[in-house]
Amino acid sequence: MYLNNYQHLKNKETYLLFFLFLFSFLIRIPVIFIFGDTRLDNEWGIIVNNLTDYGKFSLVNFGDFFVPSLFMPPLYAFYLYFFKIFHFNNEIYIQVVLFSQIILSSFSVVIFYNINKLFFSNKICILGTLIFSLFPLHIYACAQISSIILQSFLMITFFYFFLKIMKKNNFYNICFLSLASGLLILLRGEFIALFLLSILYLALFIKINLKSILIIILLTFVVISPYLMRNIIVLDTITITKSIGFNLWKGNNPQTDVEGKNYIYGSIFDQEDLDLREQINKVPEDKYYEINLDKVFLSEGIKNINNDPIKYFGLYLKKILSFLFIDLNSSNPYYYHPLHYLPVLFISITSIIGIILSKKNSYQINFLILFFIVNVAIVSVFFILPRYKLAIIPLQIIFSNIFFEYIKKNFFKT
C-alpha cells in the first residue's frame, strides 16, 4: 500500500514537471517571432564572426593581427559559436539560438520547482514556480541574444546542487555543483568572488569535510582550466577575463548613470574626454592591447571615484536600489511598460518582507540571503542593465514565497 502511494505521488510529480516544462516552452515561442533578435550585434557579433571566419577569439584587430581577447567572458561566445558549425543561414541560425534559450529557460523552471520543494508547501511551490515561468522579463529575455538566460539556468542549477550538498554530501551533487560553478566563472567574472563565498560558507557553517571542499575546487578548476591555460600560454596572465577596469569606468564616470550610459566596447575610441582618448591612443597595438587598455580604464575609474567620492557613493546606493527594485531613469523603451515594472516592483517588495520573516536558524535560507546581498553589492559597483534583474529574480521569488507561506498559514488556515 505504501509503495503504491509512493509510486502514485512520483508519477503525479513527473506529470507536473513535464507540464511545467511544456507550458514554459510553449508560452515563449510567440515571443521569439514578435520580439526576437534578428542578428548578432556588437561584441557578440564581432567575436563569433572572428571565430567563424578566422578561428580567432578576438574582439579587436589591427589589420591582419587579431588581439587575443580577454574582454568578454568566453562561455556565451562559444555557446553562440557552437550553432555556427551547422552552417545555418543567418535567419535559421538566430532562431535556433533563441529556441535553445527557450529550452534552457524551461528547464530552469523545472529545477526552480525542485528548489522550492526544499522549503515550501506544494501550493506555494507551484505558485512560485508559475510566477517564475510567467515572469515577463524571463519570457522576454529568451528572445534576446544575451547571456542572461544561460546565466539564469546555470545559477539555478548551482543553487539546487549547493542546497542538495547541505543535506546530502555525495559525489553526484559535488560533480554537478562544480560543473555549474566552473561554467558560471566562464560566463560572469564576478562569480569567482561568489564561488569563494559559497565554499567558505560550506566550510564554516555547514562544516562539510575538507576532502569534499577540495574536490569541488579541483573539479571547478578542471572546467575552467582549458581557457585559463590559453590565457597563461598566449597572454602570460592568470585570469578568465580582463574587463574590470572598463566596467568600473563605465559605471563611474562624469557622464554615466545607473545603466552606465550606452557605452559599448567599440564606442570607447570616440571619447569626449581628450585626456582619456589620448591615453587610449597610446596603448601599444600588440597582444597585450586589451590588458593594457583595461588598466587605463581602471586607473580612470578609480580617479573619478577618488575625485568625488560622495557623488559616486550616492550613485552606488542608487544602483543598489535600482537593482533591488526598479530604475527610475531607465533608457530602455520597454522598461516602464506595466507588464515589466509592476511584476518587478511587486516581487521586489514582497521579497524584502520575506527576508524579514525568514527563519534565521535556517542555514539554507541564510546562504541564499547572504549570496543575494553580496551579489547585489558587487554588481552595483559597476552598472545595472535592465536584464541583470533576471539574475536575482529566482532568489527574490524564493524570498517572496516565505511571505506567501506566512500569509497562507496565518490567514488561510484549513
Residue ranges and their predicted role:
Residues F21-I27, C125-P136, Y160, S181-I185:
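Short helix- or helix-capping micro-motifs
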Residues F99-F119, T157-F161, I349-I356:
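Transmembrane-helix motifs of polytopic, lipid-linked glycan transferases
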Residues V31-N42, Y54-Y81, K303-N307:
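Membrane-proximal lumenal/periplasmic loop motifs of glycosylation machinery
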Residues G45-L51, F66-N89, Y316-L324:
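Short hydrophobic/aromatic helix or loop-helix immediately within or flanking a transmembrane segment
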Residues P74-F78, F86-F107, I126, A141-Q144, ...:
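Loop-to-helix entry region of an early transmembrane alpha helix in multi-pass inner-membrane enzymes
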Residues L235-K318:
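Membrane-proximal stem/loop segments at transmembrane-domain junctions that anchor or position
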Residues F119-N122, F158-F176, L184, L202-I208, ...:
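Membrane-interface transmembrane helices that cradle and orient dolichyl/undecaprenyl
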Residues Q95, F107-L134, S152-F153, Y172, ...:
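Transmembrane-helix signature of polytopic, membrane-embedded enzymes
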